[in-house]
Amino acid sequence: MLNISLCVDGVWYDAINDLYCIPKKFNVGIAEPKTNYVQVPYRNGSLDMSEALTGITYKNREIAIPLLILHPEPLAVYDLVSNRFNGKKCKIRLFESLESQSEYYYEGRIRVGTLLTNDSKWEFDIFMNAFPFKMRDVLIYVDGATTKSITNEGIDTVPTITVETAMQGTWNGESFTLAVGIHNPHSMVLKTGANTLVVAQGAGKVEFAEKRL
């Protein structure tokens, strides 16, 4: 049995237990690469400039999920879902079964579709215009001298480092010093794969959203 959970304004709602709906199937589109082909006079074919500036970039992906209402008052359920989610920026997690768990989520704007009846069953679709990547939030605390191996299974990203006590150490072998405060140091890129944070002194936390197709 499939299930989903939706997050709006920082609160997660389980489709079955909180919204009285069950997903019939998942329709998750792939993120289409953005391309840029330039026609050059007197040259065979086109010049592919798709990766010239920032590497490969992607368009948003489309997600559509038909929901079957389980509650004896389907109109009330439809009103509940519409008022809580329609038009709002949300996160959504997809579960292959009631027992499965997933830290990954998609994020985008939700649109609630038309309520339909079919053989005494009430159902509607929800649609999301989603950011290209599915994401997973990672939070790592450091306090005093320590070494942390941080694995990033997604694309390269810059972490947010909240420093509570002035911090010194190395990031992938490069020295750094950070004062108390919130930092997004572009010299401390979280590369795809294994990364090593060595803290000689200080305390704080490292946060990032792992992004993968």
Regions found by a protein language model. Name each.
Residues 1-213:
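Extracellular/virion structural assembly segments
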